[in-house]
């Protein structure tokens, strides 16, 4: 089930128990993806709870989001957060 999050709600998910990131208007749970990330867990931990859109698109193409996004997406960013 997809949920709508505010930026402050996403910001609460920034520790080892629960890590969320924002990419475009999607919210992704990366908690169990840390060990699988080819670039290492360190960068994901640094972005946890934040908008990772710029960093993501700097290093990844659309195919990466298509491959992993469906598994990791837990919701969307609330309209009010898009300023």
Curated annotation (Swiss-Prot):
Sample GO molecular function, one term: metal ion binding
One matching Pfam family, short form?
Cyt-b5
Q: Which domain of life is it from?
A: Eukaryota
SMART domains assigned to the protein according to its UniProt record, in alphabetical order: Cyt-b5
Q: Which family does it belong to?
A: Belongs to the cytochrome b5 family.
The entry's heme-binding residues are 37, 60
Coiled coil stretches, renumbered: none
Among Gene3D superfamilies, the record links this protein to: Cytochrome b5-like heme/steroid binding domain (3.10.120.10)
UniProt keyword annotation of Iron present: yes
Stored InterPro entries: Cyt_B5-like_heme/steroid-bd, Cyt_B5-like_heme/steroid_sf, Cyt_B5_heme-BS, Cytochrome_b5
Q: Where is the Cytochrome b5 heme-binding domain?
A: 2-78
Query: Which Gene Ontology cellular component annotation is one that this UniProt entry carries?
Result: intracellular membrane-bounded organelle
Tell me which UniProt keywords the record has, alphabetically.
Electron transport, Heme, Iron, Metal-binding, Transport
Q: What is this protein called?
A: Putative cytochrome b5 B11H24.095
């Amino acid at each position: 089930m997809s949920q709508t999050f505010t930026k402050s709600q996403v910001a609460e998910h920034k520790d080892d128990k629960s890590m969320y990131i924002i990419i475009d208007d999607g919210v992704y749970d990366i908690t169990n993806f840390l060990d699988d990330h080819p670039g290492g867990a360190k960068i994901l931990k640094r972005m946890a709870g934040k908008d990772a859109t710029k960093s993501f698109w700097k290093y990844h193409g659309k195919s990466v989001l298509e491959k992993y996004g469906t598994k990791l997406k837990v919701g969307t960013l609330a309209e009010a957060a898009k300023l």
